[in-house]
């Protein structure tokens, strides 16, 4: 199955960043940030995104430790990925998201600065775009089959 459109998720316990990527261009861009309560999103909002974008797959970021070992959040992120698959029957992939939030904050500053706190003006969607871009770059061969 050719993957044409992919949604990327930067999973968090309070917010989940969402990005969209196109195989034809090999580019990802930020889409939105969903609120979560203790890691549980509003599944109706997730369903609306799935129905609107009709992704061929989803990519969920894995927050690995700097040494490459799984962090405590990895278990929750993988569970979120499995739930996306179970609820919406969409294939999922995971991708190392180390330093994407740090890089997203730097990108936000480069775009003209941060207005207020990161809680009020989150960078999660930027981080989702960065992790999805990394996945697209690493899986270009898979996308064009």
UniProtKB/Swiss-Prot annotation:
HAMAP family documented for this protein: Nuclease_YqgF
Q: Which PANTHER family match?
A: POLYNUCLEOTIDYL TRANSFERASE, RIBONUCLEASE H-LIKE SUPERFAMILY PROTEIN
Summarizing the function annotation, the protein's role is: Could be a nuclease involved in processing of the 5'-end of pre-16S rRNA.
Location comes to: Cytoplasm
Does the record's keyword annotation contain Cytoplasm? Answer: yes
Q: What is this protein called?
A: Putative pre-16S rRNA nuclease
GO molecular function terms noted in the UniProt entry: nuclease activity
Q: Tell me, in one coarse class, where this protein mainly resides.
A: cytoplasm
């Amino acid at each position: 199955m050719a993957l044409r459109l992919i949604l990327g998720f930067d999973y968090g316990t309070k917010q989940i960043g969402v990005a969209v990527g196109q195989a034809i261009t090999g580019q990802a861009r930020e889409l939105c940030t969903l609120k979560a309560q203790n890691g549980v999103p509003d599944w109706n909002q997730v369903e609306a995104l799935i129905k609107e974008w009709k992704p061929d797959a989803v990519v969920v970021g894995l927050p690995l430790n700097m040494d490459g070992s799984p962090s405590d959040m990895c278990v929750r992120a993988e569970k979120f990925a499995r739930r996306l698959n179970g609820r919406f029957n969409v294939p999922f992939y995971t991708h190392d998201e180390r330093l994407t939030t740090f890089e997203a904050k730097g990108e936000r500053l480069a775009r003209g600065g941060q207005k207020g706190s990161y809680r009020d003006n989150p960078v999660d969607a930027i981080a989702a775009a960065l992790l999805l871009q990394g996945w697209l770059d690493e899986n270009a061969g898979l996308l064009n089959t």
